Amino acid sequence: GMPVIEAFGAEHLRSGLPICYTSVDSVFQIAAHEEHFGLQNLYDLCQDMAGILHKMKVGRVIARPFVGSLETGFQRTLNRRDFAMDPPSATLCEWVMQAGRPVHAIGKIGDIFSMRGITRCRKGSDAQLMEHLADEMRQAPDGSLTFANFVEFDTLFGHRRDAEGYARALEWFDAQIGPILAQSRPDDLVIFTADHGNDPTWRGTDHTREQVPVLVHGQNLAQNQVFDRMIPFQDVAATVAAHLGVVAQGQGRSFL
């Protein structure tokens, strides 16, 4: 993404035309300068394009705003927005909401699920998202779902193949998540996983290693348990549903 902005940023400022590009996954991205093109104009354009591209089964249209100049360099801002296709059927978020429980999204979760089944969404940098996560876990009512996505591992370090930066980010995450887990309540269930890998030491700039870890924390769980099978996303959803006592509407089965 950044090489595209660096290559066409000056032409974008001169012509006023947006920068459009695609990725190997099912996304169409539009980059534009927040000040010269206008942030709302970019959002409106992406919304219009989503109406066309979703019919072609393109999963997401992503607004990629940036600032800066050719002389000072261009930088992306935190105002990214994803315009995703509606999920084809009800998801875990909707199961929980249908049961009368709140669903609190952190990061790009609201965009990923087109705000379906989301009570509220809080955004920001990963550092801000960690603060939001700690705050949401402190005040989460019984039976609620808090769903967080930390995207900078992918955008800042994975795609850019910055192994040292990735390592520092993991160390930061480890240091931050410990106190958050320590404040969890006896009946809380915390699951760490990802939707794909992105090895910063591998060639190219695309996602890698689709088999990602599933780590589970809970004060009432058996310690050091190792699952003896692959765990698909649908089983993660079924597990959370079973823990919360809501009806699972998918094909998954709980692994706990």
Model feature map: region roles:
Residues 1-256:
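Feature captures the catalytic ectodomains and active-site-proximal regions of enzymes
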